[in-house]
Amino acid sequence: MRLAVLTWNLYHGRAIPPAGRDLLPDFAAALAGWNWDLALLQEVPPWWPRELAHAAGAEQRLVMTSRNQLLPVRRLLAIRRPDLMRSGGGGCNAILARGTTIAEHRRLRLCRLPEQRWLHAIRLASGIWAANLHATAHDSARAAREAAQASAATLSWAAGAPAVLGGDFNLRRLELDGWDHAGGHDVDHIFVSGPAPTSQAHTLDHGSLSDHAPVMVTLEG
């Protein structure tokens, strides 16, 4: 089975330099225009995944992360002033799956403080598992522990089935037991257990959207 996997930190829906407006249509158009089967997304405004999935013709699952109290108020302010609100607008991580069916969704809280960090994963109808992580920033030891926890949990859920683990690990270099590094850029990585990359991972042209580059790799197996 051939599978194109994308990981992208959306920077809470912001741009560099600041755009001063709601960028949901821009991010949705970018994602819809790229040729992927799985998109692992971090720092996503919580009201975005459904719209992103609709634009891309995909299914979606999300896990709420931090700063989501009084979300309707946060949403209103973040839509009007995204560059002022930044992460204060609330956040989630999301997985989008295109051209297939999501059969199962699981999640695991990795820590509560200083911010909630979650692993979440989907099982596709084909049996492949795909897991999404955004690890703690500015604390390499904690980020490494969270990556190890995420690695072990995903392998346990997959129970020998092919699996993908990707996201923003907040580590430029790392190795995970039981996984092969399929590729990455800066702190964003994609690991595989079973499938093999058919070509080198590469970044996509994202213009001014986000402070992270989208990373894409095609897998087979």
Where are the language model's segments positioned?
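Metal-dependent phosphoester-hydrolase catalytic domains
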Residues: 100-111, 141, 145, 152-164, ...
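Extreme N-terminal starter segment of soluble prokaryotic enzymes
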Residues: 1-7, 128
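Active-site metal-binding loops of divalent metal-dependent hydrolases
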Residues: 8-10, 44, 133-135, 167-169, ...
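Active-site charged/polar residues at nucleotide-handling catalytic sites that mediate phosphoryl
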Residues: 34
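Structured beta-strand-rich core segments of catalytic domains in phosphoester-bond hydrolases
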Residues: 44-127
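Acidic/histidine-rich helix-loop elements
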Residues: 7-23, 136-140
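Active-site neighborhood of phospho(di)ester-bond hydrolases with catalytic His/Asp-centered motifs
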Residues: 39-42, 61-63, 164-168, 191
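Metal-dependent phosphoester/phosphodiester hydrolase catalytic core
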Residues: 127-128, 133-141
